[in-house]
């Protein structure tokens, strides 16, 4: 029995010169468009919008699982023209070169991530990466912006040079097409298609992570303040000034509306990126990572630290409400005290010298509220950073890794040895009732026994999904810009040392305050304060 062939072998439109698809194309396999649970796609080669977007490749894609639903992200505005059912036989407007990139006008329904590359006559929602050179309405695609003025909505990541509404992550740029997703760049206003790179267009755009000053119908994130309607992906909109993207720092000021992760209402030279520093005061509107209600000079990147003060408003990871000299990045410590408002990782209401980043160190103690990363109903001096810990007594409430009911009083010095034993609450690896006395180590004698909570990603961690170590421990100085103060060892793949105390010594052994233990997800304490190899 032959596979069901929905279309006759003859081409309904003589002007399409594309070859017929091979007969065996649909044999067997899911490709057959027969009674698929998701619905049958009328065209076997229709690049239906899939979860990842339309397929741009010349090979047929199985449309069955992806019926053409009308939807914000995956809608098929039109069926293929009869001749365009095979990708190779894309229907081109007369005179267009079939081999031209994006020349084919497939009325392909846009995939989740992107607009179809073919900008042909047929309006099509976006396909994955390609931008269509022709002006056809299409939904934004993943990375590639269409150079032409096509009204298209932003795809997940892609930006369209044309005025289009932003997708979840895709910026819609007005005349300027720029989809700086993660990194930002400063550039001329010329439309430039970019995937992850920064788009230099002057349009302000709001983004998932970045904010867009331009008013635009952004899907997710922030309001557009600028004259240019532009939706932005992860990267911040440059506005009049080209600005740094999500990952990269941008030297110029720009207005940004708050994006999911991005800051938006105030000017900021740079938004803190994972690796970028913010050098100028930034007003951050509420974002995924937190809003900054006060201008702060720098936000630290993942690895970088920012010396100037900044305040943050609550975000999933924890807002900073008080001025602090630096916002911590992944590894960078902040020397200045800043208070943080609640976030998923837990609100910080008190000043602490450094806001903890995922791996940042918190120098000060502050009460921490419940957070997704390990709920602490009782105030305890642990910074809200993912891995950072603050010295001080706190009760630890149940977290992903197990609950610690015991209060851990901490004594003596910023990270000084704590004489009190900490019973370990039951964790994934089981309760550890015994306290661990620690004697002198690189950092000096530490008498503290501390409970170990259930294992984190890399090992036992007192609390938090990533394993927040409540116990103070020295921060290693090193590539990540951790505290130069003495520390027995860096824990974790990146060396998570979350010592929440102000650094004193510049050398690893120079810190006068001996703190008994280096804390970390992997930290198994030995009497001498050393960590296991």
Curated annotation (Swiss-Prot):
The modification Omega-N-methylarginine is found at residue 396. Residues 214-226 have a biased composition (Pro residues). Residues 1-37, 67-251, 319-347, 370-434 are annotated as: Disordered. Residues 1-12 have a biased composition (Basic and acidic residues). One of its GO terms (cellular component) is nucleus. It comes from the Eukaryota. Its main location: nucleus. The keyword Phosphoprotein applies. This is Decreased expression in renal and prostate cancer protein. It comes from Rattus norvegicus (Rat). The gene is Derpc.
């Amino acid at each position: 029995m032959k596979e069901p062939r929905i279309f006759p072998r003859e081409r309904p439109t003589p002007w399409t010169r594309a070859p017929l698809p091979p007969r065996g194309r649909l044999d067997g396999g899911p490709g057959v468009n027969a009674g698929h649970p998701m619905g049958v796609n009328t065209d076997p080669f229709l690049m239906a919008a899939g979860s990842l977007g339309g397929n741009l490749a010349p090979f047929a894609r199985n449309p069955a699982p992806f019926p053409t639903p009308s939807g914000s992200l995956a809608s098929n505005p039109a069926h293929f023209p009869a001749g365009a059912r095979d990708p190779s036989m894309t229907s081109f407007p007369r005179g267009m070169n079939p081999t031209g990139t994006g020349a084919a006008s497939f009325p392909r329904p846009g995939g989740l991530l992107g607009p179809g590359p073919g900008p042909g006559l047929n309006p099509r929602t976006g396909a994955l990466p390609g931008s269509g050179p022709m002006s056809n309405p299409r939904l934004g695609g993943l990375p590639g912006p269409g150079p032409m003025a096509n009204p298209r909505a932003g795809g997940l990541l892609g930006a369209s040079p044309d005025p289009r509404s932003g997708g979840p992550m895709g910026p819609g740029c007005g005349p300027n097409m720029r989809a700086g997703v993660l990194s930002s760049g400063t550039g001329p206003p010329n439309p430039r298609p970019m995937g992850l790179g920064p788009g230099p267009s002057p349009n302000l755009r709001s983004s998932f992570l970045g904010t867009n000053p331009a008013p635009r119908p952004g899907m997710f994130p922030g309001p557009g303040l600028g004259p240019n309607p532009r939706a932005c992906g992860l990267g911040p909109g440059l506005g009049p000034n080209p600005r740094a993207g999500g990952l990269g720092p941008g030297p110029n000021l720009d207005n940004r509306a708050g994006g999911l992760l991005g800051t938006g209402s105030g000017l900021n030279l740079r938004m803190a990126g994972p690796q970028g520093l913010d050098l100028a005061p930034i007003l951050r509107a509420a974002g995924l990572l937190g809003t900054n209600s006060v201008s702060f000079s720098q936000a630290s990147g993942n690895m970088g630290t920012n010396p100037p003060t900044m305040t943050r408003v609550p975000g999933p990871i924890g807002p900073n409400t008080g001025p602090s000299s630096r916002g911590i990045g992944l590894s960078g410590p902040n020397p200045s005290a800043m208070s943080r408002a609640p976030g998923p990782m837990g609100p910080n209401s008190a000043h602490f010298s450094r806001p903890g980043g995922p791996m940042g160190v918190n120098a000060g103690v502050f009460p921490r509220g419940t957070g997704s990363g390990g709920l602490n109903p009782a105030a305890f001096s642990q910074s809200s950073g993912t891995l950072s810990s603050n010295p001080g007594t706190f009760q630890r409430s149940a977290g992903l890794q197990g609950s610690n009911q015991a209060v851990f009083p901490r004594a003596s010095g910023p990270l000084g040895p704590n004489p009190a034993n900490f019973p370990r609450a039951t964790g994934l690896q089981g309760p550890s009732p015994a306290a661990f006395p620690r004697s002198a180590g690189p950092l000096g004698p530490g008498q503290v026994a501390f409970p170990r909570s259930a294992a984190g990603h890399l090992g036992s961690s007192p609390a938090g999904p990533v394993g927040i170590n409540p116990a103070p421990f020295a921060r290693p100085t090193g590539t990540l810009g951790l505290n130069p103060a003495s520390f027995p060892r860096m824990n974790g793949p990146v060396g998570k040392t979350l010592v929440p105390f102000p650094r004193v010594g510049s050398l690893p052994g120079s810190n006068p305050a001996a703190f008994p233990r280096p804390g970390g997800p992997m930290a198994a304490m030995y009497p001498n304060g050393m960590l296991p190899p």
